């Protein structure tokens, strides 16, 4: 009614593919606001009784009593996670107008599935993700799998670096929900995801870069993980302390200073508390298991 171009995202659309929308739990309603309409969208949301709670990165969070949460997105993907996927999903031309509406857009089945898997991969990379995502994969493929363009999907997933991740997650969904046989790796992957809760856990954010940095047959014990956590390599630190990259040679000499700043911030701001707790408790054998999981999924985000 306000003539604001928008696109319902993620669960706001996925829930309607379940036998009943009530079977698909959502913590919030995600909607992409196209173009320069964020201010107008804010006015409309506030008029409907929503109160702005927080502005973070690529979306604004609104809440309305008793507990309805709307995330108004100005971008479909987080630039800080992977620049390649951010650029891909910044192209809104793949969306089409919803039938009978002028200002509401949707992806066709293929592009919705690509975004669904990219969003899942982002969460897995940053915090791990739960097994509800496997149900989404199963439900979506049961409904649309037979009609989607497989060549298009293969090409797009390859370009986004998501081929291995998608194949493993589809396989795990079939094992879990259709009884397909699978190797021990998939039980390990399922157990890890089950332990992540629905939305992942902060302490799991250590695995993506740690598993990337270790050699295939390198050390897998807790000591190696602790050393990596307390003294991350230059390639990791430069992501969070960009001033190291102004002069790469000098930056590597300044790496100890960045480690010190990071340690002080961790103590003062309480950052990394759950990671440190995990380092104290994790069984050494599980470090090797998680290294294997992240290596096989091949999420090389930059």
PLM features per residue range, with description:
Residues 1-27, 33-302:
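Conserved NTP-donor binding/palm subdomain of two-metal-ion nucleotidyltransferases/polymerases, i.e.
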